[in-house]
């Protein structure tokens, strides 16, 4: 018994270093895994809301473009009709 006590005292004491795991530091409940998992319900809902807002803006832009396209086509039609009217007044095309 005395020998084991002396041998334990003769060994230098090794103190453990303070360490934390990344899992413990990633956050409390609800933090997504670092592997790119789906996340918690709040994050999924937030992403869905952002995606919806983006789709709405894109839809509005698309409707604006369609409206401008219709206006341009109407303008081209009036110009084409005007050209046809002028050529009829001058006696048509003579080739």
Curated annotation (Swiss-Prot):
InterPro entries: ATPase_inhibitor_mt. Its main location: mitochondrion. One of its GO terms (molecular function) is ATPase inhibitor activity. Residues 20-48, 76-95 are annotated as: Disordered. It is found in: Mitochondrion. Residues 1-25 form a transit peptide. It holds the Pfam family IATP. It comes from the Eukaryota. Keywords: Mitochondrion, Transit peptide. One of its GO terms (cellular component) is mitochondrion. Belongs to the ATPase inhibitor family. Associates with the mitochondrial small ribosomal subunit (mt-SSU). IF(1) coiled-coil forms a helical bundle with the C-terminal extension of uS17m and also binds to mS27 in the mtSSU tail. Since the C-terminal extension of uS17m stabilizing the IF(1) on the mt-SSU is specific to N.crassa, IF(1) binding might also be specific. The inhibitory N-terminal region (residues 23-59) is entrapped between the C-terminal domains of the alpha(ADP-bound)-beta(ADP-bound) (atp1-atp2) subunits in one of the 3 catalytic interfaces of F(1)F(0)-ATPase. Endogenous F(1)F(0)-ATPase inhibitor limiting ATP depletion when the mitochondrial membrane potential falls below a threshold and the F(1)F(0)-ATP synthase starts hydrolyzing ATP to pump protons out of the mitochondrial matrix. Required to avoid the consumption of cellular ATP when the F(1)F(0)-ATP synthase enzyme acts as an ATP hydrolase. Functions through inserting its N-terminal part into the catalytically active F1-ATPase, thereby blocking its rotational movement and subsequently the ATP hydrolase activity. This is F(1)-ATPase inhibitor IF(1), mitochondrial.
């Amino acid at each position: 018994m005395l020998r084991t006590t002396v041998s334990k005292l003769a060994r230098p004491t090794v103190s453990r270093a303070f360490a934390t795991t990344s899992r413990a530091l990633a956050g409390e409940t609800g933090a997504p895994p670092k592997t790119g998992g789906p996340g918690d319900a709040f994050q999924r809902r937030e992403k869905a809301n952002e995606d919806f807002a983006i789709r709405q803006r894109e839809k509005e832009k698309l409707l604006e473009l369609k409206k401008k396209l219709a206006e341009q086509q109407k303008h081209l039609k009036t110009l084409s009709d005007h050209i046809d009217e002028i050529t009829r007044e001058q006696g048509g095309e003579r080739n």
